[in-house]
Amino acid sequence: MNKDNLIENYAVALFNNAMVDNIQDKIFEEITAINRIIIDNFDIREFLFSPIVNKDDKINVVNSLVKNTKFNKIVNNFLLLLVKNSRTAILSNIVDAYNTLLYESKNIKIVQVISANKLQPKEQEWIKSRIEKELNQKTEILFDIDSTIIGGIIIKYDSMLQDYSIKGSLDKITKALKKVRIAA
């Protein structure tokens, strides 16, 4: 099974368990918090991700951690499952996939907008309203910065890519010029 399918399977399983009790948002908050703890704490991350550390030791540590938390039992069991199956390294990917499922269940499309510089709130609102109008759907916009695009924006959602960047335009011009034959 490839990594993307594996991630999707774990995310779907977690989401389906959350749906039983109608606590999808709560589970997302909790799994995101756990992921943040692991990302922010070098010692915990190294311990959980290390192939050298005995799996039983990892399970014992996670068991003691989850007993002292107020996280939902679904989250605790899910974390233990990841440890038992040596899948803690893909937790961040699972959280992202779960987030996508959560938005899809609310009929909200996740859209990534990349700009060369940080956009002002008014610019972000304008872009969001234009995208929602074009898609005829509510959106969750993730604004990212990539100075290599020089200017303009790139919009990504699903398998679509709309490149309105200066770099993209220059790349198209370069490609077109390479095809031109100059007669001597």
UniProtKB/Swiss-Prot annotation:
Its localization reads:
Cell inner membrane
Q: What InterPro entries is this protein classified in?
A: ATP_synth_OSCP/delta_N_sf, ATPase_OSCP/dsu
Q: Does the keyword Cell inner membrane apply?
A: yes
Q: Looking at the UniProt record for this protein, which Gene Ontology cellular component terms does it annotate, in alphabetical order?
A: plasma membrane; proton-transporting ATP synthase complex
Q: State the protein's name.
A: ATP synthase subunit delta
Pfam families from the entry?
A: OSCP
What functional role does this protein have? F(1)F(0) ATP synthase produces ATP from ADP in the presence of a proton or sodium gradient. F-type ATPases consist of two structural domains, F(1) containing the extramembraneous catalytic core and F(0) containing the membrane proton channel, linked together by a central stalk and a peripheral stalk. During catalysis, ATP synthesis in the catalytic domain of F(1) is coupled via a rotary mechanism of the central stalk subunits to proton translocation. This protein is part of the stalk that links CF(0) to CF(1). It either transmits conformational changes from CF(0) to CF(1) or is implicated in proton conduction.
For this chain, the family text in UniProt reads: Belongs to the ATPase delta chain family.
Please verify whether the record's keywords include Membrane: yes
How does the record say this protein sits in the membrane?
Answer: Peripheral membrane protein
Which Gene Ontology molecular function entries are recorded, alphabetically? Answer: proton-transporting ATP synthase activity, rotational mechanism
Coiled coil location:
none
Subunit composition and interactions:
F-type ATPases have 2 components, F(1) - the catalytic core - and F(0) - the membrane proton channel. F(1) has five subunits: alpha(3), beta(3), gamma(1), delta(1), epsilon(1). F(0) has three main subunits: a(1), b(2) and c(10-14). The alpha and beta chains form an alternating ring which encloses part of the gamma chain. F(1) is attached to F(0) by a central stalk formed by the gamma and epsilon chains, while a peripheral stalk is formed by the delta and b chains.
What does the UniProt keyword field contain? ATP synthesis, Cell inner membrane, Cell membrane, CF(1), Hydrogen ion transport, Ion transport, Membrane, Transport
Q: What is its main location?
A: membrane
